[in-house]
């Protein structure tokens, strides 16, 4: 967690906490083989808390974080390093909230019913608004 925090600090993201998830459900159900099930957000909440996509580190941690920041214009909120999951947030409480939302997505995708991720247009719409202020409005738009 210290190394991730240092990389983020060097990328001008100060005051962020990196939280290592010890949740047994997440540890048992996360696999790079099933990464399609968690690569795209299923709901506005997941987009809000976990970002557009988790960072799955396959090479250099520093290089992958820098590339993620360039691609998505923000820091990675979920970092997957082999079987280890890290949540990045302003504090531990916010990181645990992200952990709960990510866990819910894993649970919903573990069921036999296929779930439809947010479309590119929905992600674009969510990106253009202040998500925290308009959270409930997005949910009502999403369920139509």
Residue positions per predicted region:
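Glycine-rich flexible loops
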Residues: 1-144
């Amino acid at each position: 967690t210290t190394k991730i925090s240092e990389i983020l600090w060097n990328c001008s993201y100060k005051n962020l906490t990196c939280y290592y998830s010890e949740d047994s459900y997440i540890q048992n159900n996360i696999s790079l083989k099933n990464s399609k099930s968690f690569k795209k957000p299923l709901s506005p909440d997941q987009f809000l808390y976990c970002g557009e996509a988790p960072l799955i580190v396959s090479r250099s941690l520093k290089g992958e974080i820098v590339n993620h920041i360039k691609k998505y214009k923000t820091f990675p909120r979920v970092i997957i390093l082999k079987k280890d999951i890290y949540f990045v947030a302003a504090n531990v409480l916010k990181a645990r909230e992200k952990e709960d939302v990510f866990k819910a997505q894993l649970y919903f995708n573990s069921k036999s019913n296929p779930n439809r991720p947010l479309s590119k247009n929905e992600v674009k719409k969510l990106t253009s608004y202040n998500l925290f202020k308009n959270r409930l409005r997005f949910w009502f738009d999403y369920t139509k």
